[in-house]
Amino acid sequence: VASHALNIFGDHSDVYACRQTGCAMLCESSVQEVMDLTPVAHCAALKGKIPFINFFDGFRTSHEIQKIETWDYEDLEDLVDKDAIKEFRAHALNPNHPCERGSAQNPDTFFQAREACNPYYDAMPAIVQEYMDKVNAKIGTNYKLFNYHGAEDAESVIIAMGSVCDTIDETIDYLLAQGKKVGVVKVRLYRPFCAQALVDAIPDTVKYINVLDRTKEPGSLGEPLYL
């Protein structure tokens, strides 16, 4: 239970509680996206050497009955980096080549060691996009770290994450037919958060940005996705 009550309808409090664990976080908004992007999370974790939380809305997505195009193991063959798998296994704990982890460090070295992981997080967005591009080339999709849907000259844009994005897509299409200049940005890679990729996804004409969060963080100036 992440808040005052248990909720199976896609509150994001539980996954937001993990955002400072150091895990990369990839979100899908539909059953088909779960099938398509789960390989991205696995492959990026191996190549980028960062653990992933691959998440989607409970019940709204996890229990949805929907026809999808499924993947076979053979479909993953050309996505997987075999060298990355070997390197991953080589770093596993093994009594034949022991190593020290979780040591006690004094102030002179603690934060130096803490900052040493920065290059891995800086590189991760490009790695995720690399594997998204491979998936796009394979099945004809257009997955990005942040996907935009709407008018090219939109003045008002919604930023959202999770199953609500599919509903927003349909609403945007309805409003576009009425001549409204609106759009939606769907967040896929939440951590590490790539600010430049978000800026690139938003049209230059935008005047208003509305961030829809599915959680409440009491005492904060804003909710996690907004911040």
Q: Can you name each region flagged by the protein language model?
A:
Residues V1, L76-A84, Y208-L212:
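A glycine-rich helix N-cap at a beta->alpha junction
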Residues A2-A5, C18, D133-L227:
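Thiamine diphosphate
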Residues S3-I8, I65-Q66:
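Short, conserved acidic/polar surface loops in the N-terminal third of protein domains
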Residues L6-G58, K82:
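Conserved thiamine diphosphate
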Residues H12, E28-M35, A104-P107, R114, ...:
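Electropositive phosphate-/nucleotide-binding environments in soluble metabolic enzymes
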Residues D36-P39, E64-K67, D169-I172:
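A short secondary-structure junction signal
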Residues V40-H42, E69-T70, D200-P203:
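Short, surface-exposed amphipathic charged segments that create phosphate/polyanion-binding patches used
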Residues F52-N147:
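Conformationally flexible catalytic loops at phosphate/diphosphate-handling active centers
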